[in-house]
């Protein structure tokens, strides 16, 4: 994955906000702008996170949906993920337009997931909190947590694995099972400093 320049990150965050606000006004999905940098037409995974402003991280989340795999061009995936995070996250009621004045938009661009090989009990040694996000898969169940989540909650590597299992609807110790697949990925994260404010690259460590 090409490194995402800061100006591209700002472009994606502004695009995500515009996609949400336009959809909440008209019910229509916006088209990618004509001035989209050509690099953002590359297929990449992306998540859009909506956080309430001036609220502790553990209770700030208002929506988060995305595409773990590079199935859409990044610019299109960002538009879709932004809209879905606002109106289709099953954990929350749909966002109302007036709420957007108090919501911080965050975009995480993902590297393709990499399967963690080797004995299950060694998995905690092969991930790093502050760098990696995780995907857990077992049978029909799967769950994903972004790299910023364990930082916000103060988890270590084993807790991060357990919570990703829980997110998948599985027992928290399922990461120790041979037939559970665990993938790691990294993300470049960009967020508004405050609603509609300057966009910054989010450092986790």
Curated annotation (Swiss-Prot):
* Start and end residues of each AMMECR1 domain: 7-201
Q: Which InterPro entries match?
A: AMMECR1, AMMECR1_dom_sf, AMMECR1_domain, AMMECR1_N, AmmeMemoSam_A, Uncharacterised_MJ0810
A Pfam family hit: AMMECR1
Q: What is this protein called?
A: Protein PYRAB00100
Alphabetical list of NCBIfam families matching this protein = AmmeMemoSam_A, PRK00801.1, TIGR00296 family protein
């Amino acid at each position: 994955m090409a490194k995402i320049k800061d100006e591209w990150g700002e472009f994606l965050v502004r695009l995500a906000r515009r996609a949400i606000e336009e959809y909440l006004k008209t019910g229509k999905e916006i088209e990618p702008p004509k001035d989209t940098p050509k690099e953002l037409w590359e297929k990449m995974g992306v998540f859009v996170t909506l956080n309430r402003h001036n609220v502790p991280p553990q209770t700030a989340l208002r929506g988060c949906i995305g595409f773990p795999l590079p199935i859409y061009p990044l610019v299109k995936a960002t538009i879709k993920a932004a809209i879905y995070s606002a109106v289709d996250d099953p954990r929350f009621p749909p966002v109302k337009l007036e709420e957007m004045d108090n919501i911080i938009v965050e975009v995480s661009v993902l590297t393709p997931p990499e399967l963690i090989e080797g004995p299950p009990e060694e998995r905690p040694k092969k991930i790093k909190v502050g760098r990696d996000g995780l995907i857990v898969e077992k049978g029909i169940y799967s769950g994903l947590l972004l790299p910023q989540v364990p930082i916000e909650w103060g988890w270590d590597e084993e807790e991060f694995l357990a919570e990703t299992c829980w997110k998948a609807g599985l027992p928290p110790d399922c990461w120790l099972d041979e037939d559970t697949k665990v993938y790691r990925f990294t993300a470049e994260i960009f967020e508004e400093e405050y609603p509609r404010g300057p966009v910054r690259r989010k450092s986790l460590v």
